[in-house]
UniProtKB/Swiss-Prot annotation:
This is Vesicle-associated membrane protein 722. It holds the Pfam family Longin. Its main location: membrane. GO terms for biological process: protein transport; vesicle-mediated transport. Coiled coil: none annotated. The keyword Coiled coil applies. The lineage of its organism: Eukaryota, Viridiplantae, Streptophyta, Embryophyta, Tracheophyta. It comes from Arabidopsis thaliana (Mouse-ear cress). GO terms for cellular component: early endosome membrane; plasma membrane.
């Protein structure tokens, strides 16, 4: 079993914790709740360090997703966990029960899900790392797009030109997403080409051997 690097998690609406889970005891729960009270309400990600632990928060649309992790877990695994929890929580409660739920009222329904997502992220660090790298590359492309747009605005170029350039930059992101598929297809064709060449060489060698044994084309005589 993987090392227990994720130790506590909760989902809150505003400052009201709707569901939480941990297998441990400690003051990390009260520290996480205190940090929640001071978080900005804007959509963002936050990480605080305290006594060998990180307190990681994902704030989106009035809900806050939190996980407390040991320092050695880094940032990729905790943030990947928060993204998974956010998606699962929104699928189950988006626009419904979560909007009016009372404090800790979702523990029975969703507490076990927090545990499952914790265990999955701790058991699959390599997969989490690969996904994080892909997302980072996509974010880098988007970052370049936004940076270029800001430069255009600084130079005072016309809006119609800005629209054209934005479309071109969006196509860069699309090209990146299809790059992996194209590379796999190219490798498959190269593989087949090599196999066909090898097969042709083998057939040619067999024919040469047969002809040399039979004395040319007079085998049947």
């Amino acid at each position: 079993m993987a090392q227990q690097s994720l130790i506590y998690s909760f989902v809150a609406r505003g400052t009201v914790i709707l569901v939480e889970f941990t297998d441990f005891k400690g003051n990390f729960t009260s520290i996480a709740a205190q940090c929640l009270q001071k978080l900005p309400s804007s959509n963002n990600k936050f990480t605080y360090n305290c006594d060998g632990h990180t307190f990681n928060y994902l704030v989106e649309n009035g809900f806050t997703y939190c996980v407390v992790a040991v320092d050695s877990a880094g940032r990729q695994i905790p943030m990947a966990f928060l993204e998974r929890v956010k998606e699962d929580f929104n699928k189950r409660y988006g626009g419904g029960k979560a909007a009016t739920a009372q404090a800790n009222s979702l523990n029975k329904e969703f507490g076990s899900k927090l545990k499952e997502h914790m265990q999955y992220c701790m058991d699959h660090p390599d997969e989490i790392s690969k996904l994080a790298k892909v997302k980072a590359q996509v974010s880098e492309v988007k970052g370049v797009m936004m940076e270029n747009i800001e430069k255009v605005l600084d130079r005072g170029e016309k809006i119609e030109l800005l629209v054209d350039k934005t479309e071109n930059l969006r196509s860069q992101a699309q090209d990146f997403r299809t790059q992996g598929t194209q590379m796999r297809r190219k490798m498959w064709f190269q593989n087949m080409k090599i196999k066909l060449i090898v097969l042709a060489i083998i057939i040619a060698l067999i024919l040469i051997i047969i002809l040399s044994i039979c004395g040319g084309f007079n085998c049947g005589k």
